[in-house]
Regions:
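Histidine-centered catalytic micro-motifs
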Residues: 1, 19-31, 142-151, 173-189
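Active-site Asp-x-Gly
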Residues: 2, 139-144, 160-166
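General secondary-structure edge motif
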Residues: 3-6, 121, 153, 177
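Non-catalytic, topology-defining segments of multipass membrane proteins
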Residues: 6-126, 191-196
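Membrane-embedded alpha-helical segments that form the functional core of polytopic membrane enzymes
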Residues: 6-17, 132-136, 165-176
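Transmembrane alpha-helical segments that form the membrane-embedded catalytic/substrate-channel core
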Residues: 15-19, 63-71, 128-155, 180
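N-proximal short alpha-helices
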Residues: 107-110, 114, 146, 150-153, ...
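Long, positively charged, glycine-interspersed low-complexity recognition regions
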Residues: 155-197
Length: 197
């Protein structure tokens, strides 16, 4: 499981140590202000009273334009050993070095992919390994449905989380995470078993 977690984290630009701890906090304090739930901000561009920022996340490739607000920037900061707010508030002190090392590995892999593209005179490595997440607007739609517009700062997942229905193809792509209340109530159940709950 851990190997696939590492691969999926790289594919989604989620540094795995940071993601493990921020996601644990997200399950404990869904839609909470204090402690801050970094995963329910809607997106890196979301601000509660700014409708433009809300809709801009659906523009394919927008994270390339707003790089300074992206998870890429956070990974680079961590790779440089800089402590971000999410690192301070979510990651235990004894795991921060793991986060820094993992971020350095991510940056090294990005550079290797770019180097391979230059050496082979082909954009294919970049198109296959670096850009797909930047154009995954459909996943953003599904992700935003999980908590947006629901109660904040409440411990009962039935009020801060929702499940939705997806067709079988989208359900496969989304790894059955449309069963999101079930995922929050039973986080250790593998995603393929969520429909059985």
């Amino acid at each position: 499981n851990d190997i696939f977690y590492q691969i999926a984290s790289f594919m989604n630009n989620f540094e795995p140590v940071r993601w493990r701890w921020s996601h644990s906090l997200h399950h404990s304090y869904t839609a909470s202000i204090d402690p801050h739930d970094f995963e329910v901000e809607g997106s890196i561009f979301w601000a509660p009273k700014n409708l433009f920022n809300f809709f801009i996340v659906f523009v394919p490739g927008i994270s390339l334009i707003f790089f300074h607000k992206s998870l890429h920037k956070e990974i680079i900061w961590h790779a440089l050993g800089l402590e971000t707010r999410v690192m301070k508030e979510c990651i235990p002190d004894d795991k921060k070095k793991d986060c820094i090392n993992s971020s350095r590995l991510f940056v090294a892999l990005w550079l290797v992919i770019i180097f391979c593209s230059i050496i082979f005179n082909s954009l294919l490595p970049i198109l296959l390994f670096l850009l797909p997440k930047c154009f995954a607007s459909l996943n953003m739609v599904w992700g935003l449905t999980q908590h947006m517009g629901l109660k904040e700062g409440i411990k009962d997942h039935r009020f801060s989380t929702r499940s939705i229905r997806l067709n079988p193809i989208f359900s496969f792509i989304y790894w059955k995470m449309e069963y999101h209340i079930e995922h929050h109530m039973f986080p250790l159940v593998p995603s393929h078993n969520l429909p059985k709950l």
